[in-house]
Amino acid sequence: MALDAAVKQSIIKEYATTEGDTGSPEVQVAVLTQRIKDLTEHMKEHKHDFHTQRGLLAMVGRRKRMLSYLKNTDIARYRALIERLGLRR
């Protein structure tokens, strides 16, 4: 259920603000969004996988906190990110 290394690197490359950037909120939110999408698909098939459900809820909460941080620090970057990711906020 973990992200494939190539997929993760492509996400990092797409959302990085500078070369080698892996810690910016944009990159972290993009990686979390992909993991959330993957786990959501897993949960559609395995409805009773409560350990995964708990991890999924933790990731959603972490992404929500990062988006909130980004919204409070730089609203333009926040709006651009949710537009690129297709998130509803």
UniProtKB/Swiss-Prot annotation:
One BP annotation, GO: translation
Record protein name field: Small ribosomal subunit protein uS15
Alphabetized NCBIfam families for the sequence: S15_bact
Cleaved signal peptide residues: none
SUPFAM superfamilies reported for this sequence: S15/NS1 RNA-binding domain
UniProt record similarity statement: Belongs to the universal ribosomal protein uS15 family.
Keyword 4Fe-4S: no
Subunit structure: Part of the 30S ribosomal subunit. Forms a bridge to the 50S subunit in the 70S ribosome, contacting the 23S rRNA.
Cellular component terms (Gene Ontology): cytosolic small ribosomal subunit
Function: One of the primary rRNA binding proteins, it binds directly to 16S rRNA where it helps nucleate assembly of the platform of the 30S subunit by binding and bridging several RNA helices of the 16S rRNA. Forms an intersubunit bridge (bridge B4) with the 23S rRNA of the 50S subunit in the ribosome.
One Pfam match: Ribosomal_S15
